[in-house]
Amino acid sequence: MAIRVYKPTTAGRRNASVSDFSELTRSTPEKSLVRKLSKTGGRNSYGRMTSRHRGGGHKRQYRLIDFKRWDKDGVPAKVAHIEYDPNRSARIALLHYADGEKRYIIAPEGIKQGDVIETGAQADIKPGNNLPLRNIPTGTVVHAIELRPLGGAKIARSAGAAVQLVAKDGAYAQLRMPSGEIRNVDARCRATVGEVGNSDHANIQLGKAGRARWMGKRPITRGESMNPVDHPHGGRTRGGKPPVSPWGKGEVRTRRPKKASNKMIVRRRPNGKNRK
């Protein structure tokens, strides 16, 4: 993948860039593998806003991605197409299995049309092949990793994501996450060899607010610029207040401190200036 930078012909084009989509081989999805996708606008079933700054955006169809490949052990598949998926940053690959079934998977870096993909403990160590962590050599880069055996891929699914298998200790495998955290995962869990493709996605510049709106993202307004009736930070009085939400709630961590899987973390991710 490469990045195409626009010439500054207008204010919106200045500093804007897009993917050149050169790796794609088809523009329309497989009809049997798409489903309707309804928009919520950040509202729940009561119509109340539960997620701010969401709404609008282009219509999308959801592509059914196979995150549980264990039921295809021993069945080879050929990569029929590399396609765009509007619901994720990574590209997706359409596989045609030898038994006639078609499925989508996350497209790894380096995969191309016509490649043969395998699944199972005896599969070769090459990008796109899926096998248990206990059968993967130490030092290998993997993605689409299960947290529980047969639970489906949960970790490292976005563009450019890569996790390194650093050690094996009995029933567990140690993985170095993109954040730098090292954690134990059951060695029976499956992973796909290689890193996720489309790694240049992080370098794309939207260039204008309109492109964010096409993606369903609405503007963010600072609480300090509002009136007191709208936000605790509103009005001319400044300082003396800890940051809070519009409803007066302080900063809330998104991870429970007593989460059961904490015991699987060998080393926490580096913080602040120690992060690389």
From Swiss-Prot:
Residues 255-276 have a biased composition (Basic residues). Transmembrane segments: none annotated. Disulfide bonds: none annotated. InterPro entries: NA-bd_OB-fold, Rib_uL2_dom2, Ribosomal_uL2, Ribosomal_uL2_bac/org-type, Ribosomal_uL2_C, Ribosomal_uL2_dom3, Ribosomal_uL2_RNA-bd_dom, Translation_prot_SH3-like_sf. SMART domains: Ribosomal_L2, Ribosomal_L2_C. Pfam families: Ribosomal_L2 (PF00181), Ribosomal_L2_C (PF03947). GO terms for molecular function: rRNA binding; structural constituent of ribosome; transferase activity. Residues 35-58, 218-276 are annotated as: Disordered. GO terms for biological process: cytoplasmic translation. Keywords: Ribonucleoprotein, Ribosomal protein, RNA-binding, rRNA-binding. GO terms for cellular component: large ribosomal subunit. Belongs to the universal ribosomal protein uL2 family. Part of the 50S ribosomal subunit. Forms a bridge to the 30S subunit in the 70S ribosome. One of the primary rRNA binding proteins. Required for association of the 30S and 50S subunits to form the 70S ribosome, for tRNA binding and peptide bond formation. It has been suggested to have peptidyltransferase activity; this is somewhat controversial. Makes several contacts with the 16S rRNA in the 70S ribosome. This is Large ribosomal subunit protein uL2.
